[in-house]
Swiss-Prot record:
CDD domains for the chain: UBA_EF-Ts
Compartments where located: Mitochondrion
Keyword Transit peptide: yes
GO cellular component, one term: mitochondrion
Disulfide bonds: none
GO MF annotation: an example: translation elongation factor activity
Gene behind this protein: EFTS
Keywords from the UniProt entry: Elongation factor, Mitochondrion, Protein biosynthesis, Transit peptide
Transit peptide: 1-42
Name of the protein in question: Elongation factor Ts, mitochondrial
Native source organism of the sequence: Ostreococcus tauri
Length: 338
């Protein structure tokens, strides 16, 4: 296998692939995504002209699909790193093809160099995160791929070149996938907490999270980051949920209540209750605190006299779809070409 490097390979939207993907593939993918019976999957796709997202919503409305929060698929390997300093924090993901490579010294040195280079840039130039990052309410900024590749290692080498060198050394595809950064506001009393799960080395593991808060201790902020890794929230609070996401959830819930025969005012109360339940699942402040489930995260933070500012979580390979290979066919092809 010849080594190569790709920057920020992201999962395409299912709708965009519809014209290029066979009907059997769409059925297979939606079946794996939802766990619904194949008969229902095929019926939903047929009813919606093989629009997989519309079919997915229809299956959810019938209670045949897994919750959106659990629908993500993690396939790719590699490692993530969390690194904080006095004036900022970064989360970084580098992908490899195998866990064996991810545990190797050269790969772990690479991801540490990536995190250190990014943190140096963030702390030396606060504007960098604003000029080269995409803002999302309540989250760290997602840095653009072209800027990450230009950052320099401690010996002056661009990160893109450092990745290429490691790819050549380990003989695998290695890629800088994504980075999130936060530049702390001087004098604002912001506290940064981090947590790394599945540690491969100090600050490097399979999943990591960062929480930025005010008015709490660093120890408590680290506990909040641990909660983020354990509970996988998607948004900081309910007002951070994008309007289109909220409308989509409401539409699914409304479809589920159709034909119930209940008065309109009762239906609206049911919808409000289901939305509140949704917020409890996906919003950090609304979740039950893992260290004390008698209160929400928001109440736990307020009990410490603080408030949440932002958070982000990164899990190795999350959102990347990897082609499933027929092992027997792969071996046969290898024999044929040797």
């Amino acid at each position: 296998m010849s080594p190569s490097i790709a920057m920020f390979t992201l999962t395409p939207n299912a709708r965009a692939l519809a014209s290029k993907t066979s009907k059997m593939d769409l059925i297979k993918n939606l079946r794996e995504r939802t766990g619904a019976p194949i008969v229902d999957v095929k019926a939903a796709l047929t009813a919606h002209d093989y629009d997989s997202e519309a079919a997915y919503d229809a299956l959810r409305a019938k209670g045949l699909a897994a919750a959106a929060k659990k629908a993500g698929r993690t396939s790719a390997d590699g490692a993530v790193a969390a690194l904080s300093g006095d004036r900022g924090v970064v989360l970084f993901e580098v992908n490899s093809e195998t866990d064996f490579v991810a545990r190797g010294e050269s790969f772990q040195s690479l991801i540490k160099e990536c995190a250190e280079a990014t943190l140096r840039a963030v702390e030396s130039d606060r504007a960098m995160t604003e000029e080269h990052g995409t803002a999302t309410a309540g989250a760290l900024r997602a840095l653009r791929d072209e800027r990450i590749g230009e950052l320099l290692t401690s010996d002056g080498k661009p990160l893109s070149d450092a990745v290429r060198d490691v790819a050549v050394h380990v003989r695998e595809n290695v890629r800088l996938r994504r980075a999130f950064a936060y530049a702390a506001t001087v004098g604002a009393g912001e506290v940064i907490g981090t947590y790394v799960h599945g540690a491969l080395a100090p600050g490097v593991g399979k999943q990591a999270a960062c929480v930025v808060a005010k008015g709490v201790s660093e120890e408590f902020a680290n506990k909040l980051a641990m909660h983020v890794v354990a509970s996988s929230p998607l948004y900081l609070r309910s007002d951070c949920v994008p309007t289109d996401v909220m409308e989509r959830e409401l539409a699914v819930f409304r479809t589920q209540t159709e034909g119930s025969g209940k008065p309109a005012n009762i239906v609206e109360k049911i919808l409000a209750g289901r939305m509140n339940k949704y917020y409890e699942e996906v919003c950090l402040e609304n979740q039950k605190f893992i260290l004390d489930d008698s209160m929400t995260v928001e109440k736990a933070v307020k009990a410490e006299g603080g408030e949440l500012v932002a958070f982000s979580r990164v899990k190795v390979g999350e959102g990347i779809e990897v082609e499933e290979k027929d092992f027997a066919a792969e071996v046969a092809e290898a024999v044929r070409t040797t």
